[in-house]
From Swiss-Prot:
SMART domains: AAA
Compartmental location: Cytoplasm
Spans annotated as Small ATPAse domain (RuvB-S): 183-253
SUPFAM superfamilies the record matches: P-loop containing nucleoside triphosphate hydrolases, Winged helix' DNA-binding domain
Organism: Rhizobium meliloti (strain 1021) (Ensifer meliloti)
Gene: ruvB
Enzyme class, first EC level, given as a word: hydrolase
Comment, domains: Has 3 domains, the large (RuvB-L) and small ATPase (RuvB-S) domains and the C-terminal head (RuvB-H) domain. The head domain binds DNA, while the ATPase domains jointly bind ATP, ADP or are empty depending on the state of the subunit in the translocation cycle. During a single DNA translocation step the structure of each domain remains the same, but their relative positions change.
Renumbered residue ranges of the record's region Head domain (RuvB-H): 256-346
Protein name: Holliday junction branch migration complex subunit RuvB
């Protein structure tokens, strides 16, 4: 199963981009309480001074609301919002075109900034720090450096892999913001809001069941809600109940913990083929026929957060929670081996 085919894949899809479902203000935004509280202060201070907000870096797994927060920030600052992504900016001229079209205090959002071309990144440094573009015009002996003054803008960037950002780029963001997985209670509020906007009846138990299986991710909660709505409408149900939500999600192969076939293949392979681990990431990638990046960025964060696996210097290891969830008995020596690995980590 490819990552793109997964119902619970946290990456954006066309159906996820319904603007009417997005919160429009920080007060409407559910979850990330600490980040929202700080952003409110920074936004109000910048607005009162009539200055551009300092550059902001959002860090966290996909689907947690980085793009939505960037849009809300621009709206609350009362400025224009421009959006792009790291892979799209292929050359310096692409970046120059974006920056020179910005007005004073505008917000430029760059998603996946860790995938920015290194040559483009070099151009970004003076733009962020001095609001100037340093461009080389011409080639060979006729080449000359030209400085272009820019409007004072705010760069809001998002990354799922902070470690891939260079230190010079990372240090130029004055406001780093880490986003965390959402609680079931927060996701339940998001599901309720989505159902209300859809005109869909929803019981407390139905909302909680969808929230429990959404992997701590609002984007996945919205996607599951839409699929459960399909089942409810075909069944001519007046509201989504626990029974309808459970039956729909079970038929979609999303289990009680939000794991799908690929997650279970990951855990089962380590359990049955490698005795619970440790096993290296390259071996896992080959066994699943999935890219290493997809495993590290998409599959493993939630499994680690739920306490199903440990990352150790010698490889991935299943925990007692994973064995229990799979309904398998761990080898007799698994607890002792995990204890030794924990000591090695320390």
């Amino acid at each position: 199963m490819s990552e793109a085919a997964r119902l619970i894949a946290p990456e954006k899809r066309g159906e996820d981009l319904d603007a009417t479902m997005r919160p429009q203000t920080l007060d409407e935004f559910t979850g990330q309480a600490e980040a929202r509280a700080n952003l409110k202060i920074f936004i109000e201070a910048a607005r009162n001074r009539g200055e551009a907000l300092d550059h902001v870096l959002f860090v966290g797994p996909p689907g947690l609301g980085k793009t939505t927060l960037a849009q809300i920030m621009a709206k609350e600052l009362g400025v224009n919002f421009r959006s792009t992504s790291g892979p799209v900016i292929a050359k310096a001229g692409d970046l120059a075109a974006l920056l020179t079209n910005l007005e004073e205090r505008d917000v430029l959002f760059i998603d996946e900034i860790h995938r920015l071309n290194p040559a483009v990144e070099e151009i970004l440094y003076p733009a962020m720090e001095d609001f100037q573009l340093d461009l080389i015009i011409g080639e060979g002996p006729a080449a000359r450096s030209v400085k272009i003054d820019l409007a004072k803008f705010t760069l809001v960037a998002a990354t799922t892999r902070l470690g891939l950002l260079t230190t010079p780029l990372r240090d130029r963001f004055g406001i780093p913001v880490r986003l965390n997985f959402y609680t079931v209670e927060e996701l339940e509020l998001i599901v309720r809001r989505g159902a209300r906007l859809m005109g869909l009846g929803m019981t407390d138990e139905g909302a909680r069941e969808i929230a429990r299986r959404a992997r701590g991710t609002p984007r996945i909660a919205g996607r599951l809600l839409r699929r459960v709505r399909d089942f409810a409408e075909v069944a001519r149900a007046e509201a989504v109940t626990l029974k309808i939500a459970d039956e729909a999600l079970t038929r979609l192969l999303v289990d009680s913990m939000g794991l799908d076939q690929l997650d279970r293949r990951y855990l089962t392979m380590i359990a049955q083929n490698f005795g619970g681990g440790p096993v290296g990431i390259e071996t896992i990638a080959a066994g699943l026929s999935e890219p290493r990046d997809a495993i590290e960025d998409i599959i493993e964060p939630y499994l680690i957060q739920q306490g199903f696996i440990q990352r150790t210097p010698r490889g991935r290891v299943l925990t007692a929670n994973a064995w229990k969830h799979l309904g398998l008995n761990p080898p007799r020596d698994v607890e002792a081996s995990q204890f030794r690995l924990t000591l090695e980590d320390d």
